[in-house]
């Protein structure tokens, strides 16, 4: 596939940032060289305002926000419980585009988490049960032994969702679209959500 650096001009997009995101996301999904188009950097802060960041996978997006699933005892989930203000970054270099999101993270309903967990592969379900994410692992064999035990325990049976695993939705209040331009004259357009739910957009210097 030949990449067109001019691409979809930011100033030609609609006034709905989620529609723009959808167009860009569909574009990057078609680029075979992008191994994880759903990868996004999630930045959080602890109670002392010390930041941390990691890559998570976008599982769904809608007007309600950007959704991912994780161990709810992990560092990111603990920090979100203390401070729900987060940031996301989608870095799509092969198509010369980036999306930055600022928003409020909220824990999703159990029914939503149950439905998504049921759709996962059996191996991923077992992995969710056996991984004490971010905790110290003395030896990898310990984890593999837990997996083997659970495989035997639930052989031929449905695996329920662990209570410590679920979904988080980032409700955006700022979305910025960045696109590479010649001579570093990049396109940047920032959308900010108004109290009534509408969006106001401005252009930013590159």
Curated annotation (Swiss-Prot):
UniProt keyword terms in alphabetical order: Flavoprotein, FMN, Oxidoreductase, Pyridoxine biosynthesis
GO molecular function: FMN binding; pyridoxamine phosphate oxidase activity
Enzyme Commission numbers on file: 1.4.3.5
InterPro entries on file: Pyridox_Oxase, Pyridox_Oxase_CS, Pyridox_Oxase_N, Pyridoxamine_oxidase_dimer_C, Split_barrel_FMN-bd
Top enzyme class: oxidoreductase
Co-factor: note: Binds 1 FMN per subunit.
Catalytic activity entry: pyridoxamine 5'-phosphate + O2 + H2O = pyridoxal 5'-phosphate + H2O2 + NH4(+); pyridoxine 5'-phosphate + O2 = pyridoxal 5'-phosphate + H2O2
Disulfide-linked positions: none
Name of the featured protein: Pyridoxine/pyridoxamine 5'-phosphate oxidase
């Amino acid at each position: 596939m030949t990449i067109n650096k001019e691409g979809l001009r930011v100033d030609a997009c609609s006034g709905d940032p989620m529609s723009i995101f959808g167009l860009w996301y569909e574009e990057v999904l078609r680029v075979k060289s992008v191994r994880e188009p759903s990868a996004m950097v999630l930045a959080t802060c602890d109670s002392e305002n010390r930041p941390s960041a990691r890559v998570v996978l976008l599982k769904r997006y809608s007007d309600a926000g950007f959704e991912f699933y994780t161990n709810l005892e992990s560092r990111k989930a603990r920090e979100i419980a203390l401070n729900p203000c987060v940031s996301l970054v989608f870095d799509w270099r092969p198509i010369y585009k980036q999306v930055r999101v600022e928003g409020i993270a909220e824990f999703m309903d159990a029914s939503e988490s149950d439905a998504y967990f049921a759709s996962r592969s059996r191996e991923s379900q077992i992995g969710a049960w056996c991984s004490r994410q971010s905790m110290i692992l003395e030896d990898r064999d310990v984890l593999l032994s837990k997996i083997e035990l659970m495989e035997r325990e639930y052989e031929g049976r449905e695996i329920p969702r662990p209570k410590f695993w679920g979904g988080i939705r980032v409700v955006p209040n700022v979305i910025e679209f960045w696109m590479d331009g010649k001579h570093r004259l990049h396109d940047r357009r920032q959308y900010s959500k108004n109290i009534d739910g509408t969006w106001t957009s401005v252009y930013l210097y590159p």
